[in-house]
Amino acid sequence: MASAMESDSSGGSGGADAQPPLAEVDGGLARVTRQLLLSGDDPAARLRALMPLELGIFGLGDLAQPVLVRDFLNTLTLMSGHAYPAAVLRHHAYYLLRAASFSRRSFGLGHLEAALDVLASSLPPTTASPATDDPLDGSRLIAETRALAAAYRRIIEEGSGEVLAVSGPTATFAFVEELVADTYLARWDAFPREGLSFYAFNAAKTTLGRWLVTVYAETNRYPWAAAGQGQPTAADIKAMAVELVEHSGGGAGGGEGEESGGGLFHRPESLSSVVASLPLARRRAVEILGVYAEASGGQTPPVAAVPVLAFDAARLRLLEPSGALFYDYVYEALLWDQTYGVPDSVIEAFLAGMAAEMEALAARVQEAAGSRASFSPAAIEQVATVLLSAGLNETVAGDYAMMLASVPRVSRSRWRWLEATAALLESLSGFALHFFRLLPTASPTSRFARVARAAYLRAEAEAVDRRARRTSGPSTPAAAPAATAVGVGAAADPWDAVTPLRIFIVPPPAAEYEQVAGDLSSELLRSLLWVRYSRLWQAPAPAPALPCKPPLLPGEQGRRQWTAAVAAAPRTDVEAYCRSLRAGQTARADPAYVHSPFFPAAFIEFQIWPALRRVLSNELPKTRSLAALRWLVSFGSDLALPSPELTRARRPLELIYATVWEIYDGAPPMPGESPQAVGLRPLNLEGEGKAGDAGAEGAEDEEGGGPWGLSSHDAVLRIMDAVREVSGIISETISASERAAEAPPLAWPTSLFSLLFTLRYSTTAESLGLATRRFLVSGETLSEDISRLTGAAWRLCSRPLLYDAETGRVQIPLATEEEEEAVVAVKEKSVSSSPRHYSTDLQTLKSVVEGIQDVCRDAAARWALATADTATLRRRLLVPALRESRGIADHPLWAHTSEPLRPDLEELNERVEHALELGYSLTGALRRSVAYRFRDYTFARLFQPPAIDAERAEAIVRRDARPPPVFIPAPRRLPQGGADTPPPLSMDDILYLGKSICKALVDVLDHHPAAPETTPIKTYTPAMDLNPEQITVTPRSPSVLAAFARTARVQTHHLVPALTDDSPSPVGQTPPPFRILPAKKLAAILLGNGRNASKRRASRDLSPPPHGRWRAVLDSSPFSFSSSDFSDQDEGEGGEADLRGVPGGGGEGAYEEDRERPSDIDTAARAQKVETSCPRRRSPRTTPSPSRRASGGGGPDRGEAEAHTYPPYLSAAAAASRVRPRTRRGATRRPPRPTAEDE
């Protein structure tokens, strides 16, 4: 038998849970004929020879060869003395046509017509005309098949969308199922035949809204309904693209001036990685710019140079809710925290409208599906029309599923209604994916019935996972009010996305099989028919029609008949004969004993019970176990008297045999399945098929729905059900015997169940276990890599940065040697008396900030995708196995077993679920880290456009213009104190960021940039008796402050001490770092620094000293900024609390004293006084060592003063030489970088 199921060399390879691919019956009719000739008089051997035709299929081309058909029928004629072969021979036309298949794509309708001619010639002359009373008459079946072939040819040629309707015995033919599937395939390929009403197009208020609908409809070639505005022409599409680019786009360049949200196209505010670079928004922009380039005669720009499609508050208000599923670029941006300056109130109003519209769409889907619980092509078309009209097809659903899987779930809680909208998108896209994957092959066939059932169960598992994720995930308090505000319940209980899929569930054709079974003369043939039915349709067979016992003659004649039967074979002799039989070895039955009325009970008690015990105990090898089961089914079946008990016992034994064979050797292929072609295509009407013209796209490889005819998902459960049925029959037989009191209790071993379950799911468990281990290892690696990056980001933003406005240099505080060596120094203030700084330029700092966020977000996106893939793998591989294992554990058969079987898949499921919890936790931790929003939030002000430019600054100083009304809200002050305050950056962190994020950070920058060239813009002559005044500005100044300084220095020679605005900031609130002051005060402050102001740094070490002694200086200085000015608490995230400030000390008197002194008027002596008046704890030295003093001109006194006034910093070369190697695991590991190959 195993050799009959050899794999086809041309077959593909399955997945991790796939068994070897199976060909059709090797050799077809020729091999079956040879096996029949070798079987002789052994009924078990005959059963083994015919089993491939009973349960499998063979190529239709074999029936077109008269020699093969003749040899097969002649072999059956030699065995016509036995009931089983005689029944096959009597209905050979039905028997052969039932298993014939088009699955080898070289077969077509020409081969079918030739096969029908051969079968017609094989019929006896007496049955040349159809018999009206025999549904299995050969002539009648051939005539019906010819009519079906003609109808199929007409349907395919006309292409009218009509489908083939079949009833009667021909519905059980394998090739007829394939013809039906082909007509349905042609119908779905042409769908939709009628135009779709894109109501979002007519309701759109903007050109962008109409453009999105037009691109969707034209890309997918959907027909437009005649009503409404009609289908846009090519000229209309080009005109829309031109309008979007030239009139509302603000220029396709997306330059710096558009960051405020004025244009339709923007550069992403921060994202530059592959996964997290807003791919949907970029694709939308590519579509618009591509048509625009075609309309304007230009070339389409490369994708890397194209900005993303963005939005502003005005455009967001104009987006109609009816097009909710067309705004994927908006949802994508919001989930990645890209708002383009749109207020939260506008975003929440938009999301509320979209959530309400999507819930209405879900209700329309439910209404279209109705309450139908079985296959309904009309309902399928209605649901498809609703989804396609709303803008949701398989591609769009896949994009939404990928987007939602790649974004951390905690991102959904930032705005009210975002969680509700994302939940509805998730359920709608998941339903649409299942729906449109089932749609192309939907047909009332056995293969699709298995696929649809598997998809339905998978959808149920996904719904359970979604509910579990919502209940166990992070709380979203904003989602609950959002759900109840206008009656939208998506956040709490999204719509039922599983029940509508019932319109794909195909009911089995039980009536047709009943009609066939009623006309079969062999009980064995009838039982095997129902085994085939159970396997094809994964449905339980109805209870067998029990034969009636031969009636005894009445009165004295009946007693004589009974006496004669008992005398011919007494009960004891029959029992002794049954005891002497050897299961699987005794070939011929003795009619004298088999005809006895005592034979059924004795055979059940002395053969079926002990033989089945040996099979279930796994004491026999595989071949002997199968042989024993075949023998129990076939022994004496042709000779024994009709017996209800024996018939009831042999039906489940046949099912056990077929299922065990299925698990051991793999099931033979079923209708519609082929190792060469997955999926169905219309057949070649001329008889020349196209081999392999369909790829694996859309193929289902799960739960017995794949192309290789794998064992069904509940194979072990079916065996247990059959054993339980046999148990009941054995118990009845034993209880009716005379030895009922002496019989041992009925108990079954479980070794075979354990073995079969292991064979069924060992590959699945091993694959999933390996995938889980790899997932955990990759998570550990990612944690080690990304933790160093997030830690460096945390330390970078935990200390104020020093900025030199003159040179554009930034000084990053570094940890002292004591801080690097003492780990416990973090819990208390441990600041060395000689702080170190690392110098870099402002552009490099911006690149570092951007790179940190990009790497963190890319890692979060890729890890979220990996977690989603692992969850999908669990649903696909483990959930079906769990269903069966739980059914096994709760099976009532264990009441009659010695040791209940407890499959260990629950432990594997716990490990996988624990791994997924860790994956979700890591994704949430990345999302809450400060690095995730490093550019968008912490250092956002670095990337904002300047408040004023140099020209306007000069005009303000010259009193030619009023100060602009630009006031930046003051950020929250960093929390002071705390045990978790991180130390400053170390040089290891600097080198790490330089190697992995921005190489320019560690480049040698010993030279200073040359002084910018100045250009005179106005000269006053002595004609008015005034001294000439040279007013110069810098064409490309490092900052606006430099322009202020240079212009004011030549304007004013006297100063009035002034420090703050007329309305100082409230106590406890940090004023804005760039404060717009009146021109007089600004000029006075700038000139108060003296003529050497241009040589002095405009910013000093403004780290918050003890208690606010320098608070006035910090609050009033318009030149300095620190990372505290850029950071804020991440609302609702709970992850930004790791930003800490540097608390200080001091008294109120010092504060009052400093209020009357300009912020930048200072001397080295006062700086030294301040330093000594505020001693720092845990500092072993009060003066820096000579090697750590600031370099520069001046005498010893000035150098010593400068050493106190300006903190020293290291150059890149010096920093590299002072780094000590680290041996911590993963210290030199680079974090994941975004690459083009990332998925």
Curated annotation (Swiss-Prot):
UniProt KW keywords: Host cytoplasm, Host Golgi apparatus, Host nucleus, Virion, Virion tegument
The record ties this protein, via InterPro entries, to: Herpes_U30 (IPR007611), HSV_ITP (IPR034738)
Predominant place of localization: virion
User: Which processes are annotated in GO (biological process)?
Assistant: virion assembly
Please give the Pfam families that the UniProt record associates with this protein: Herpes_U30 (PF04523)
- Family as reported in the entry's similarity comment: Belongs to the herpesviridae inner tegument protein family.
Protein name, entry field: Inner tegument protein
Origin organism of this chain? Epstein-Barr virus (strain B95-8)
